[in-house]
Amino acid sequence: MIRAQIDAVLSDIQIDAIKIGMLATPAVIDAVADSLAGFRGPIVLDPVMVAKSGDALLQDDAVACLIERLLPRASLLTPNIPEAERLLSGKSDLIPQEQGKALLGLGPAAVLMKGGHADGAVCHDYLVSESQIVGFDAPRIDTGNTHGTGCSLSSAITAGLAKNMALDEAIGTAHQWLHGAIKAADKLDIGQGHGPVHHFHQFWR
């Protein structure tokens, strides 16, 4: 069913870039990987596998399948620190730039190490490739409404790549947009608990 849905879209619409989020099982990962075998555009892989609580969302067999089937296809891998540690078999003694370099060895063309889980008044993200390391910094915002920050960032980067932006430009533009979305998040009043960022902050004043 999943492969049929992807095949239907790819055969009907020109797809300029693809973002992959959480894939729960090896069967789902295999279906996505098989469907994208002929796709030659940029692929952004957000390896969602650790909940904000620290609980694992993917079993070990799914993580292994993700590493084997999809990391080598990724134009950009966007892990946070706990996800990077999981992909690197629990290595926690590396700084983010070193984690990014180690993850390049698993196949992605570039890695964006997200620093939102770290401490400090400034969030530091690092774009790591074979040729360079580029930093993207933003002041940490005191809000409880940060649900979906990583997914939103990877989606915004993918949108930039679909518009033929260079990778560092797509990341910088997405970073600016997400900072505004977090800053405006407290204007929303949606449900109980951990609220979402304000995706439409540029339009809803």
Residue ranges of each PLM-predicted region?
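Conserved N-terminal subdomain of the carbohydrate kinase-like
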Residues: 1-52, 57, 200-203
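Nucleotide and nucleotide-moiety/phosphate-recognizing core
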Residues: 27-39, 109, 132-133, 167-169
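Conserved phosphate/ATP/ADP-binding segment of small-molecule kinases
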Residues: 60-133
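Short, small-residue alpha-helix embedded
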Residues: 85-86, 144-167
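Short pre-catalytic strand/loop immediately N-terminal to key active-site residues, enriched for Gly-Thr
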Residues: 133-147
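Phosphate-handling active-site elements
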Residues: 133-134, 160-174
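Charged C-terminal helix
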Residues: 169-205
